[in-house]
Regions:
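Short, well-ordered coil/turn residues at beta-beta hairpins
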Residues: 10, 134-135
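A short, basic/flexible loop-to-alpha-helix module at the beginning of a structural domain
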Residues: 17-30
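Beta1-alpha1 glycine-rich phosphate/pyrophosphate-binding loop at the start
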Residues: 28-102, 151, 188-211
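Core beta-strand elements of the Rossmann-like FAD/NAD(P) dinucleotide-binding domain
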Residues: 122-130
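Glycine-rich dinucleotide-binding loop and its adjacent helix/turn
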Residues: 136-211
């Protein structure tokens, strides 16, 4: 099952970060500091299970610029009108309240591997014993002339990262006149979530069929 695979993956990660020591030995030793960069599926899951599998002995800090996790694989359901954005969103406060993960809402701008510190956009630094990198993707909007400006103005929305643009894209669909043309561009491979564009095209076609 997905839960079992997820548990095995995070168990392996925890074992690596704990230096291969048994959890019973780790629980008696001084706390180690782990900084996790990125609060997507990988980063949030790693932060949660590092706390759990260390008996809450590890000091885990998650650096993520957003205050809420939005499920990207479910976002096309929002575009298609089957779900609302709040139904696929989860605040990160649950990681702090339920698992003791420290949250830092910011971006990482530099990593000093010798000093074992990460520098934040606000100028502060965080020390670490172990570092987990899970920042996700970035968008190469400059690859198509004019796309960056059109995206910044809200004229062309990609919604490749689920969130405000997902809602914006849905609103654009609702505002389209009858007989209007919808254009969807599929990025050159390799790209994140290969089925994504085809799922979106299907959801949009279903919306047009109904309305």
């Amino acid at each position: 099952t997905m839960q079992r695979r997820q548990f095995l993956q995070t168990s392996a990660l925890a074992t690596a970060l704990l230096g291969g020591m048994p959890l019973s030995a780790t629980a008696k030793s001084a706390k180690g500091k782990v900084v996790v960069i990125g609060g997507g599926y990988g980063g949030a899951t790693a932060a949660k299970y590092l706390r759990m599998l260390s008996g809450n002995q590890l000091d885990v800090t998650l650096v993520e610029p957003n205050s809420t996790f939005v499920s990207c694989p479910m976002s096309n359901l929002v575009v298609g009108g089957i779900r609302k954005i709040n139904e696929i969103s989860t605040p990160y406060t649950g990681l702090t309240r339920n698992h003791g993960v420290k949250m830092v809402k910011d971006y990482v701008t530099a990593i000093d591997v010798e000093k074992r510190t990460v520098k934040l956009k606000n100028g502060k630094t965080l020390p670490y014993d172990k570092l987990v990198l899970s920042p996700g993707i970035d968008l190469q909007l400059d690859k198509i002339e004019g796309l960056a400006a059109a995206n910044a103005s809200g004229q062309i929305l990609q919604a490749w990262k689920a969130g405000p643009e997902t809602v914006g894209l849905r609103k654009q669909l609702e505002a389209m006149p009858d007989g209007g043309t919808y254009i969807l561009n599929v990025p050159l491979a390799p790209y994140r979530c290969p089925p994504g564009p085809y799922e979106r095209a299907s959801m949009v076609a279903n919306y047009f069929k109904q309305y």
